[in-house]
UniProtKB/Swiss-Prot annotation:
Part of the 50S ribosomal subunit. Contacts protein L20. Keywords: Ribonucleoprotein, Ribosomal protein, RNA-binding, rRNA-binding. This is Large ribosomal subunit protein bL21. PROSITE patterns: RIBOSOMAL_L21. One of its GO terms (cellular component) is cytoplasm. GO terms for biological process: translation. It holds the Pfam family Ribosomal_L21p. It comes from the Bacteria. It comes from Chromohalobacter salexigens (strain ATCC BAA-138 / DSM 3043 / CIP 106854 / NCIMB 13768 / 1H11). GO terms for molecular function: rRNA binding; structural constituent of ribosome. HAMAP family: Ribosomal_bL21.
Length: 103
């Protein structure tokens, strides 16, 4: 069984027992989280597609940790001017483990 959820403006295909990194959520480590923006639920041949959400469906997850991702380096050049600007960014994330899918 798998589901497609929406979190932080992105869509994720999740299965029970899977861990994934979501955009930062204000939830403490070890707490249980309910994701109710479920776009699709599939169980073998039974597929439920929402318009836009599947009613009554939710995905439960446990918060494993919070952290920051890899550094993204931004470099801007101005040609022939001997000018360069460097900048870096590390995005915060919340790592969750999917504990259940209900439809």
């Amino acid at each position: 069984m798998y589901a497609v959820i929406k979190s932080g403006g992105k869509q994720y295909r999740v299965q029970e027992g899977q861990t994934l990194k979501l955009e930062k959520l204000e939830v403490a480590t070890g707490e249980t989280l309910e994701l109710d923006q479920v776009l699709l639920v599939a169980d073998d041949d039974d597929v439920k597609v929402g318009a836009p959400l599947v009613e009554g469906a939710k995905v439960t997850a446990e918060v494993v940790s919070h952290g920051r991702g890899e550094k993204v380096k931004i470099i801007k050049f101005r040609r022939r001017k001997h000018q360069m600007r460097r900048q870096g960014h590390r995005q915060w994330f919340t790592e969750v483990k999917i504990t259940g899918i209900s439809a």
